[in-house]
Amino acid sequence: MNIAKIIDHTALKPDTTKEQILKLIEEAKQNNFASVCVNPKWVKEASCALKDSSVKVCTVIGFPLGANTTATKVFETQDAIKNGAEEVDMVVSIGELKDKNDDYVEKDIEEVVKAASGKALVKVIIETCLLTEEEKIRACKLAKKAGADFVKTSTGFSTGGAKAEDIKLMRKTVGAGMGVKASGGIHTREEAIKLIEAGATRIGASASIDIISEN
């Protein structure tokens, strides 16, 4: 199984340096990862370095809390695309989801989808570790209804990461036609394969080299 082609090679820590970003980019090019996932500050740098490569530039929106206003998320999306982003991973408005304010949650996603329309894929991070099963299902349904391309488990900055049972639930909820991204705490090839077998079509990891280096 060629896992590399579905990995978003990720560096989102606040203390990430330019040297680390350049290393990330080189590793992504050498191993044909799906994308590099970097904070918005680094999108232009990554886009320039990857212009002759099949590796996409992915960034994060409303990250890591999802508590920005919709207008802020829209601006972040537009700015990221202007700087060269081809995929955006937005964080759902978790508090509004828990308050059952589904219209707000759907509109929040929909506006980012509109801002990205035809220019970038949109992945919606639902932060599974903070949600009940009912909330996970509702979040996935709202993301699909709003026109997002993927649902994604985690930011990697909360209380937990990707679990196979969550991926199974997300896949069952969105059906076969939508992407499901597993991220957060994935360190080994074995873990990645379990998540793929559960229904993940993309893996987000900072330990990508370790994952693909294992037999």
Swiss-Prot record:
Pfam families: DeoC. It comes from the Bacteria. Its main location: cytoplasm. The active site is at D89, K152, K181. InterPro entries: Aldolase_TIM (IPR013785), DeoC (IPR011343), DeoC/FbaB/LacD_aldolase (IPR002915), DeoC_typeI (IPR028581). Its EC number is 4.1.2.4. Keywords: Cytoplasm, Lyase, Schiff base. It is found in: Cytoplasm. One of its GO terms (molecular function) is deoxyribose-phosphate aldolase activity. It catalyses: 2-deoxy-D-ribose 5-phosphate = D-glyceraldehyde 3-phosphate + acetaldehyde. Coiled coil: none annotated. Signal peptide: none annotated. GO terms for biological process: 2-deoxyribose 1-phosphate catabolic process; carbohydrate catabolic process; deoxyribonucleotide catabolic process. One of its GO terms (cellular component) is cytoplasm. Pathway: Carbohydrate degradation; 2-deoxy-D-ribose 1-phosphate degradation; D-glyceraldehyde 3-phosphate and acetaldehyde from 2-deoxy-alpha-D-ribose 1-phosphate: step 2/2. Belongs to the DeoC/FbaB aldolase family. DeoC type 1 subfamily. Catalyzes a reversible aldol reaction between acetaldehyde and D-glyceraldehyde 3-phosphate to generate 2-deoxy-D-ribose 5-phosphate. This is Deoxyribose-phosphate aldolase.
